[in-house]
């Protein structure tokens, strides 16, 4: 994985096996998300006492926070099997019907990116979630017939990074909805120490703190940075991940103290140096950094906005005062602070000018 996507919250095919090796297996091993963890524990324990599958579960939140891990944990806590698929992989209702009819009693069906499931398949899923039955249409035209098929009672765990794209009928069929939040630096340090033990990586407390501060509040990024720092420590140091080793390694990979990579800094630098801090339109900003507008909007902006370095305004993107200082630039007098004239109220009435 290159430095440009080292801090991406999305997982690549090449790192799935490595990521799985440090994934928590049980709810007690899952770090942080105390509210969600407690609620989920009540749901699962209640289902086990009754001897019936729990309500269908919807997990929402940014990528890399543990939605897939929680889906596997649900199956482990219930002592059942899990079937894993994704919304884009289910193109036809027949694909989904084949999966549903192959489930055993009490099994967990995990659909990642459930908001991207095809509409015909989604409509088939409604009856399966509510009545544990699917109607498979055989034939076409006036001669088509619907054959009802029973489905074993199961639990659907859906994961989405964009809950707003779920249709109302789909959202309403989930009996338990949980939103995962970004991790605190302290929680990420705990997670890094656990991952280091599993991977056999010697790490100091200040080394874990240094990595956690650059991980954007995301466990997947924290574990990825740990593996890259481990490589540096083994090749160019004594094998121990210390603060100094982590700083040197992440400098090589162009990840700065705030977790910004090359593209993030390019966006801020263009805003400040080329457009005097903005406002500037998204398309113009993308051209300035040599990227597609959707790359800037979907890859860079979410973290820059959350970090308080960039603001989206009706007139365009604006670099905040924190962005200027992070780049080591001094904003012109009056750019920020009490000397800035207040924004005009759209509905204010000004006296007529002579």
UniProtKB/Swiss-Prot annotation:
- In this UniProt entry, which cysteines form S-S bonds? none
SUPFAM superfamilies per UniProt: P-loop containing nucleoside triphosphate hydrolases, Winged helix' DNA-binding domain
Extract the ranges annotated as region (Small ATPAse domain (RuvB-S)): 184-254
Keyword Cell wall biogenesis/degradation in annotation:
no
User: Where are the stretches annotated Head domain (RuvB-H)?
Assistant: 257-354
**Catalytic reaction annotation:** ATP + H2O = ADP + phosphate + H(+)
Q: Which GO terms describe its biological process?
A: DNA recombination; DNA repair
Residues reported to bind ATP: 23, 64, 67-69, 130-132, 173, 183, 220
Subunit structure of this chain's protein: Homohexamer. Forms an RuvA(8)-RuvB(12)-Holliday junction (HJ) complex. HJ DNA is sandwiched between 2 RuvA tetramers; dsDNA enters through RuvA and exits via RuvB. An RuvB hexamer assembles on each DNA strand where it exits the tetramer. Each RuvB hexamer is contacted by two RuvA subunits (via domain III) on 2 adjacent RuvB subunits; this complex drives branch migration. In the full resolvosome a probable DNA-RuvA(4)-RuvB(12)-RuvC(2) complex forms which resolves the HJ.
**Regarding domains, what does the record say?**
Has 3 domains, the large (RuvB-L) and small ATPase (RuvB-S) domains and the C-terminal head (RuvB-H) domain. The head domain binds DNA, while the ATPase domains jointly bind ATP, ADP or are empty depending on the state of the subunit in the translocation cycle. During a single DNA translocation step the structure of each domain remains the same, but their relative positions change.
The protein's name is Holliday junction branch migration complex subunit RuvB
Lineage runs: Bacteria, Bacillati, Actinomycetota, Actinomycetes, Micromonosporales
Q: In the UniProt record, what gene is named as encoding this protein?
A: ruvB
